[in-house]
Amino acid sequence: MDTKLLIALSLICAMACVAQGYGAPGKTMSVQGESLVLAKTEPGNLCFDQVTKGSLTLRSTYVAGKKGSVVYTEGVDYVVDYAKGTITRTANSRIPDYSTNCLYGQKDFDHTKFPSFSNHAWFVWADYQTTNGRSWAKPHDQSKYLADIRKKLEAGGPFKIASYGDSITAGGEASETGFRFQYRYAAYLQAKFPKAKISVQDVSISGYSSQQGIDWFDKYIGTVDKPDLALVGFGMNDHNIGGPDPEKFKNNLVTLVKMIRERKGAEVILFSAFPPNDNWHYGSHRMAQFAEATREAAAEAHCAYADVYSTWEMVLQRKDQSSLLGNNINHPDDFGHWMYEQAFEAMKF
């Protein structure tokens, strides 16, 4: 990826969380590109309450100013409760009514029985300032695992990141390549270590699990030439009904870390997944166990861990799941990919 583009993307990442005393509770913080779906005249929660009056804008595209983007009008298309941090459609709003989505209100749904289950046509995107902001992810020290990675980045020169996982890592529901979490993280690292020339190669296996990650190793990540760092994230498909139990999943991840180190000579970061739609029929709805298994695998394999699950759970304390899911099942939208990247930034090394 071009260095200038990486730096530009890093600025996009940074714009979404600019704080006085980054992430501290109760601090003023700007949020950009937060996604919502709004039904009828029911209020939808933002990530934070105590929104600064007059700071909120709402549009139809993730990127402000994109051709064809509609900027909605407060008081005409929506109303804001600034203290509570909610947005509500008006009765005659131009904002798409999410109650017309085929999965709205469905319980235990089988997505194969519905003609279209995407949320993209219903998303709106908010920019605002809150005076009650906090960190998206808890910082944690991973320097004992990533010290050599830091040395390589500081030294400069080519630095290759390989990403290996399921359809989320393959970019599921991100609208542009640069908005996928691994490219956002590469942009963050590029800005932090300007001497490095960072590239990303994704070799993910959409629709499959950690077992296929092992079985098809040579066909996928085995083809990457001299990666320095591998971002490895399975779990969304493992977690489905009929998948392996968390212990087997953990062992698979430990095996993958060992294979990557021995065969490719790369350091590894394992990252957890988030809970899919609670109303989806095919989920086992025990993602907390798979997230914990990922953390345990990282500890056992002595590699770094990015805690995506906890970041997602923090956001879900206020927001509904559909407002974060591009396919309304298990793929994050652009804002969700940004949340993933925040979990990576929280690793300090």
Role assignments for model-derived ranges:
Residues R263-E267:
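A short helix->loop->beta-strand "cap" motif at the edges of active sites that frequently abuts
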Residues S167-G171, I205-Q211, M236-I241, F274-D278, ...:
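Solvent-exposed loop/turn segments at secondary-structure junctions
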Residues A8-A16:
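Bacterial N-terminal signal peptides
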Residues M1-A8:
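Bacterial N-terminal signal peptides that target proteins for export
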Residues A273-F349:
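Catalytic His-Asp segment of secreted/periplasmic serine-dependent ester chemistry enzymes
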Residues I205-L229, H239-V254:
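Catalytic-core regions of hydrolytic enzymes
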Residues T130-S204, W216-A230:
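Serine-esterase "nucleophile elbow" of acetyl-processing enzymes
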Residues G21-K84, T88-P96, C102, F109-R134:
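Extended beta-strand solenoid/passenger and fiber regions
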